[in-house]
Structures are given as C-alpha cells and as structure tokens.
C-alpha cells in the first residue's frame, strides 16, 4: 500500500501485443488442440459471412413435366432434337380395347375351360392321339372289309340298320369290330405270380353318344357265338362217334354188364354271352336289337329285368332249348347266380354297357362278383362307355393294366350339329320363375316351324309331332314340372323311378321310335278325311274354337331325370331343355347326347338362374361351338 493506504495499480506489461501473440502461437500442439475444441462453437463463422452454395442456381425453379404432360397438342413446337424412345411405351388395356387390337398379355390369361378345370371329372386324351386314330380308320369305308360271317354281314342292312340307304360303319365300329374279331392269344400255363391276373382279353370301347357303340360290340359277339356253335357241333359229333364205338366194344366184351351213361349237361340257363346294362329301360332297348339280328342269324336270345314277372324270367333263362345271348341287369343276374351257380359257367363274352355306371359305388361290388364267377370260362371282357371319368380310369389302370383302349377322335365332345342356347330366368318376364321360363321356351318351339323338310308326303299326312325332353336334377321335381306344364296347355308327362314300369315302356316308346313313312293306304285315308272336313261348312266354327284354345298342338314333352339320359336312343327328339344346370360335364354330355344321333341336328336350351354356374355353361357352349372335348 502507498501512503494513501490504497493498493497500487498494476503496471502495464512490458511486452508488446505482437510478442504476446507470437508466444501464444508457439504453444504445444496438444494444448492448442484442446483450446480449439473448447472454443469451436464460439469460433463458428456466422451465416452472413459464408457464401451460399446455391448462388449459381436461378431463383425460379423450372418445373419438370411428367410423362403424361410431355406429349400434348403443342409438344412438338420449337424442338431442336427429336425425342425418340428406344423402347416404345406399352399401351394401356383401355386404349387397346378402344382400338380393337388384341391385348399384349392375352396369352398370359387363363385359357379355355378355366371354370371346368376346377371341377375336372373326365380323363383327358391328347389330341395327337386323336389325330392318329382318325388317320388309322380313314381307309375303312364298308362293313365288307370286316372278317364277319356272311350271314352276320348280310343281316346288318336288313335287321340292324333298316331303312338306311348308305350303310357305312361309324368310327367306333371301324376301331372295335376288327379288334374284337381277333382270336384270343394262346393261353400260357399260369404261375403262382399270375394267379391274380385275369386270363381273358379286356377291351374298352369309348366313343361319343349316338355313335353306334351297341352295334360295335354286338356284331363281334354274335359272330363269336355262331363260330362257337359250329365248333361245338363238330365236337359233339366226334364225341357221339366215340361213344358209339365204346358202346359197341362194351357190348362185345360184356353183354350183360353195361354201365349207365351219364346224361350230358343241359344248356338251359347257361348263356354263351351276357350283356349287362344298368337300367331296365336299356335292357328293353338292347334286347330288341339283339332279337332283331336273331331273325336272320338264328341264335337264341333273351332279356330279363325287374319289369318282368318271375315266371317270364324263368321261362326266358331256363328254356329247354338253351340260350345264347342274355341281356340283364347286374343285381338280378347276381341274385339268380347265387341259387343257380351254373348260369355263369359257359360265358365266353361278357359286355358291360355303360361301364362308368356299372363300376361306380352302387354297382361295383355286384359287377365285380359276376366277373369273378365268369372268369374260368371267360375269353373276352368288353367295357363300353361314352365317358371315362377319372375314377373309372384309375380303376382300370389298377385292376386291368393290360386293357386295350379303343377310343374315337371325338370322345367327350358334343357334336357341333347340336346348338346350345342359354335363357337367363332372372330377367323379365320370368323374374326367377324357372317353370314359367320352361313353359315359354316350349311354347316358342311348338309354335315355330320345323326347319327340316318333312318329306314328299308332308301334304298328305298330319303335321309332324315335335318331341321335347326336359331334364331335372331331382326326381321329386319331375312330377311338379310336368303338372305345371299341363296347366299351361302343354302335353307333358313325367318319367322317373317312381313311375310305373308299364307306363315307362309306353312313354319311352313315343320318344325312341321314329315314325315310319306313310303307306299308300294311309295317304288315301288322309286325303279322304281332308276332303270330308272341307266339305262340311258347319264344322268351321268348331275348328276356330279349337285354334283359339290355349292348347299347344303337335308337341309332346317328357320331363325326366338322368334315368333317360344314358343309352336311350331318342331318334325322334330334336330338342332338349335342361331345367337345371347339370352338376358335372358328364351329365352335360349324356343329357345333350340325346340329340344329334345318327347324324341328325338338334337344339339344346339351358335355363340359368342366379345361383347357377354361368361360367361353366359359357365354357361348355364355347367348347361345343369349337368342337372340342370337354374335361
């Protein structure tokens, strides 16, 4: 402290500022780094003293045009270079539809039968195989090219196909008859490994509906029966000669000690060939064809079913003269075989007509039992069907791996001469009333004229009656639909399992038998009747009243189930109405197969409702138009 008692003021440093700055710069680098890190935030330069990196960019940002705005009405103006794309841009589906061009990804879309593939029921057959079969049978044009007996060949035009001018074999007949006429191979001695394998030849005849499958297997069977009959007569003659020679020797050696002769086994109740069919209606139809050939070929045939009385069945099967060909149902034949085991002891040919039905769940045990009992004497097993479901194909591959498959090129296809129309019952005026839509379609068909000419006798006879089949899915609805149609003035009848057997035969006869051409007496009678009606004037008001009544004339309708969809030869039917959409393509084939038989045209109509599979109906219709096989 100084004299005034205060602290002395600090003296100014003797070192100048420049020297002090140099001393600070000469500090160690470690101390300097520590100091710079501590004061880094304080030493950051302010924004106004830093240049902006966007100085070179313009203040107004130029908008880039998108792909949609790049091309416009003025896009090509003031351009210095051509903007050509290396790869053109793909057009939208809407633009392709407007221009009518096919879409680029049409091949990636689902092909035909997308809906049917989801419920595939039939076994597919490659089209290469179909083409090979078609080329193979192209050279066969006449029944004379088959190695048939002369008496059998001459009976084809007179008994099997009467009334036809040009008698030519169908594709299935060209395939099946030569193969079925082949003699079976020489039997080799069975071994232990071959005990379970069948020792007879197996054949599968698969062809479209109405293609003549019945005649394809019937002619070879009749030919084989006649050949066996001739061989049996020769053997019987030799046996009688040997027995006579032995009898003479016994008489010489032992005149008073003669052994009693064993009587030969009777042929009563022992058919040579059996044809199995699933229904009694098919028994009657096939039995008539078998009987027709017997008039000229001379063999004994018979048919038995549940429609016949027990006395008639016994007289037919156990006739003293024997029986050669028998047509029966599996359950009836199996029940007879339990009490009469010799019924199947002489069977050399066994035919399963409609094999897909005879080998399904309901018939398979009975049919298999009959085949196993007839196996010791069986030489040929023939399976015949218009459809090959997957279940049948798997069964045949497992049980009969060596079966010979004879399939036609048009298997599983509905003929193109059959047209299919679709009626939407949800639209006006039906509004979901399926029965009303069915009645309206029938009235339209009945009132329309017949497209085909009725022949040169059309002006002499009465108008031709139109026959229409209506298929329903449930048997209970057959009577209901028929009753509704009758209330609308339509001559309709129902046919189902609940119908009387005698009534079934009468009804089916009207729809299966084509009317023959009128005789000269019938033409004269029709002319007299017409002159008589025209000469009485007071009958004209009655005719007018008849015409004004709500009755559909010259039209008959049969409402039925699948009972009449398999094998029934409905030559007189030109129209089929599917009251319900069938469950599978198999039902489509069999129901529409009642049309287009023997080369005739037909028309099918399906009623489609709100809950029906319209996509399935559409694909079936497209497949029919293209002539392709269904799946």
From Swiss-Prot:
Record-level GO BP terms: maturation of LSU-rRNA from tricistronic rRNA transcript (SSU-rRNA, 5.8S rRNA, LSU-rRNA)
Boundaries of the annotated transit peptide in chain numbering: 1-45
Main location: mitochondrion
Biased composition (Basic and acidic residues): 98-108, 180-193
Span of the annotated motif Q motif: 141-174
Gene Ontology molecular functions: ATP binding; ATP hydrolysis activity; RNA binding; RNA helicase activity
Region (Disordered): 68-112, 180-199, 229-249
Family annotation (SUPFAM superfamilies): P-loop containing nucleoside triphosphate hydrolases (SSF52540)
Residues that, per the record, bind ATP: 207-214
Compartments where found: Mitochondrion
Enzyme class, first EC level, given as a word: hydrolase
DEAD box (motif): residue ranges: 353-356
PROSITE patterns: HELICASE_ATP_BIND_1 (PS51192), HELICASE_CTER (PS51194), Q_MOTIF (PS51195)
Keywords: ATP-binding, Helicase, Hydrolase, Mitochondrion, Nucleotide-binding, RNA-binding, Transit peptide
Family under the similarity heading: Belongs to the DEAD box helicase family. MRH4 subfamily.
PANTHER family xrefs: DEAD-BOX ATP-DEPENDENT RNA HELICASE 50
Name assigned to this protein: ATP-dependent RNA helicase mrh4, mitochondrial
Native source organism of the sequence: Aspergillus fumigatus (strain ATCC MYA-4609 / CBS 101355 / FGSC A1100 / Af293)
Lineage: Eukaryota, Fungi, Dikarya, Ascomycota, Pezizomycotina
Gene designation per UniProt: mrh4
